[in-house]
Amino acid sequence: MRLIKVTGGLGNQMFIYAFYLRMKKYYPKVRIDLSDMMHYKVHYGYEMHRVFKLPHTEFCINRPLKKIIEFLFFKKIYERKQAPNSLRAFEKKYFWPLLYFKGFYQSERFFADIKDEVRESFTFDKHKANSRSLNMLEILDKDENAVSLHIRRGDYLQPKHWATTGSVCQLPYYQNAIAEMSKRVTSPSYYIFSDDIVWVRENLPLQNAVYIDWNTGEDSWQDMMLMSHCKL
């Protein structure tokens, strides 16, 4: 059996689930481990069922028991300890019967050969969207120059994240991105998503901008749905 640890918010869960789909293609006895999600309070829990109606494939036990079982019986495979751009550790055959995978798999190389299945799996359930998001969907589908601009601040500006993400959360990064997009799209319409809309309005004044600020809490996934309907 292969167990794949799930943690993080919706985006990370999607990467991990895509990795699970690929693993399942070659190794039918694979399950998703939600044990850590029982204690994860940063985001909104495991969202694959609620947002995408994906089937239940989970394994979940209490944390102390899980750690004992993991230590005694499972061989651990860590994404961060593997060679860059190498899938060998995930594809090789192991004699150890129980394998435990930890990582975020934030690259299409982990599931490029099943990209159609991944896209089909991540189909948003529009029936669960609120009225404002549904109205915005109609606008986006008619706007041929719709450009989504997601500006994440908050946790990414904390010192512990600075080495990996801090540099892409600074004003020049977004200014350069807007300048580049203006070269590629004639009269772009910017649909802006952010966890700090006030900062965006003050620091990135745009003439043709719509600020999406109503999807909070368990409705946060609707921002991603709206982004997927932008042309860029």
Protein language model annotation of sequence segments:
Residues 1-3:
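Extreme N-terminal starter segment of soluble prokaryotic enzymes
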Residues 5-15, 38-39:
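A short, glycine/small-residue-rich beta-strand->loop->alpha-helix junction that serves as a flexible
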Residues 6, 34, 151, 192-194:
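Short beta-strand/turn micro-motifs composed of small residues
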Residues 10, 175, 179-232:
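Donor-binding and catalytic core of enzymes assembling or modifying cell-surface/extracellular glycoconjugates
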Residues 15-23:
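Short amphipathic alpha-helix
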Residues 22-28, 184:
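A short, Lys/Arg-enriched amphipathic alpha-helix followed by its capping loop at the start of a domain
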Residues 29-40:
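A short beta-strand-loop structural module common to alpha/beta enzyme folds
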Residues 43-185:
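Secretory-pathway luminal glycosyltransferase catalytic domains
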